[in-house]
Amino acid sequence: MSARISFLKNPDPCNHLSDYKLRYGTDGYKSFNNLFRCFNDARIKIKLQGIDIPRCSYCSVYQKRLYICLICRSISCSSHILLHTQLNKGHDIAIDVERSELYCCACIDQVYDSEFDEVVVSKQLFGLGMSVKSGADVVAVRSNKKRRLDSQLIIGSNFLVSPRDRREKWTFPLGLRGLNNLGSTCFMNAVLQALVHAPPLRNFWLSGQHNRDLCPRRTMGLLCLPCDLDVIFSAMFSGDRTPYSPAHLLYSWWQHSTNLATYEQQDSHEFFISLLDRIHENEGKSKCLYQDNEECQCITHKAFSGLLRSDVTCTTCGSTSTTYDPFIDISLTLDSMNGFSPADCRKNRYSGGPSVNAIMPTLSGCLDFFTRSEKLGPDQKLNCQSCGEKRESSKQMSIRRLPLLLCLHVKRFEHSLTRKTSRKIDSYLQYPFRLNMSPYLSSSIIGKRFGNRIFAFDGEGEYDSSSSSSPSAEFEIFAVVTHKGMLESGHYVTYLRLKGLWYRCDDAWINEVEEEVVRGCECYMLFYAQETVIQKAHKELSYQVISMADAFPFADC
């Protein structure tokens, strides 16, 4: 989709928010200043005087998501928020009590306003005992050649993490920076944090291989997602510690994915796939990965592209037909019937119930299930060239070539078309921080099929099942995207592993966590990098805080 845009313009607010600001300006925001409370984790929540547990004024429920009207301060749950605005004309804008985010009752959607964020972040800094700048300095927009950042809140402040980590924040690895939630955009922030710290992508953008100042699309005023990502990478590695608002990238992605252009909660995995597709298209490459025996050279496929092998074997004559398909991620089935939910784990821990480790799903089990031999049903008979007719057959997947970066997607969301129902699988999944993918390679799978005999494999030499693992099959984890909560109203958080330590990236909030916290989360997307890539990144990327005058460091991959 070709479009000319202003690159320094945030997405427009909805009409209801615009009408509210015409009538009340920002006075309504400021009137809530005495209700905002800064808690120990640096989050801002609304605390009503004399009310310990807020409840919906219509049904008295307190366990659902609650919203407080900006005009009358009436509290409504998610089931009655629309009713409130229907009964009270003009009462369209409310605040999420738990997350202190703006919500439009008429649009049934979260909305973003930088002036509201200014009030909230000012309260955060005040609660953390830090100085707050005023006037134009508070939301000044920088136009530095290296960083064209917008919506910067409280520039020059020291806010990044909770009070527990404040004294140590400057020892955090370079690139750790919070991302503001622009209205149910945690799905985007979670993926961006993982991609920003992926060594090949970090190397690509910080070394100027896609320079927004030289991009022909950008100079013509056209949309270019790689240019927007260039801005993101420059901002994240600038040394600035204030939370950053990726509004330009969100707007640009909306233009490319018009069906997803909404402030409603989206799926992180869908965003990941969509973003990589848009990067591929914007770099002007062919959509076909393999054409005339040449692989696509865009950064998306250089980093994430692997090759799957599919063997379909006739159960009558034993002949095998082989096909190859490229992939940029692998989706794994999570067997919820044999797994523990978070509540089960807590219950069994104290009641002496069955061992959690005994029946908890594991990543190796999911990969075994993915590469198992599967008998196709009678309605899936395929034409066997040897038999000359349709025969029943079996199918087995394996990995012919591994990518530099391996993304494993855990299928937690189930949608039934026949029953018209959807549900989320909350089972825990055990996964290693170091992963050996050798057992799932085509060489290993075929070796087992033929009794681990030595044989010629694809004309590329002899395969010996006893040979040691290839270094390229050893992977180390560097990011985990998690999903917590219900299907429609959950929340995405990313855990990053940098220099052997783990950091929790929850929108604008970043803090260091213990390894056990990461192992106990509900993983949704697992990002691994080849061990050699991680080792080279550790050697060549400096984690010292740099000023804007310094050159950006980068790591070869």
Swiss-Prot record:
The active site is at C186 (nucleophile), H491 (proton acceptor). Disulfide bonds: none annotated. It holds the Pfam family zf-UBP. CDD domains: Peptidase_C19D. GO terms for molecular function: cysteine-type deubiquitinase activity; zinc ion binding. It catalyses: Thiol-dependent hydrolysis of ester, thioester, amide, peptide and isopeptide bonds formed by the C-terminal Gly of ubiquitin (a 76-residue protein attached to proteins as an intracellular targeting signal). Zn(2+) 1 binds at C56, C59, C77, H80. It is found in: Nucleus, Nucleoplasm. Gene3D superfamilies: Cysteine proteinases (3.90.70.10), Zinc/RING finger domain, C3HC4 (zinc finger) (3.30.40.10). SUPFAM superfamilies: Cysteine proteinases, RING/U-box. Residues 177-531 form the USP domain. It is an enzyme of class 3 (hydrolase). The keyword Protease applies. A zinc finger (UBP-type) spans 36-130. One of its GO terms (biological process) is proteolysis. Its EC number is 3.4.19.12. Zn(2+) 2 binds at C69, C72, H84, H91. InterPro entries: Papain-like_cys_pep_sf, Peptidase_C19_UCH, Ub_carboxyl-term_hydrolase, USP_CS, USP_dom, Znf_RING/FYVE/PHD, Znf_UBP. Keywords: Hydrolase, Metal-binding, Nucleus, Protease, Thiol protease, Ubl conjugation pathway, Zinc, Zinc-finger. GO terms for cellular component: nucleoplasm; SAGA-type complex. The keyword Zinc applies. Component of a deubiquitination module (DUB module) that specifically deubiquinates monoubiquinated histone H2B (H2Bub). Does not seem to be a component of the TREX-2 complex. Seems to act independently of the SAGA multiprotein complex. The DUB module is responsible for the major H2Bub deubiquitinase activity in Arabidopsis. Belongs to the peptidase C19 family. Component of a deubiquitination module (DUB module) formed by ENY2, SGF11, and UBP22 in Arabidopsis. Interacts directly with SGF11, but not with ENY2. This is Ubiquitin C-terminal hydrolase 22. The gene is UBP22.
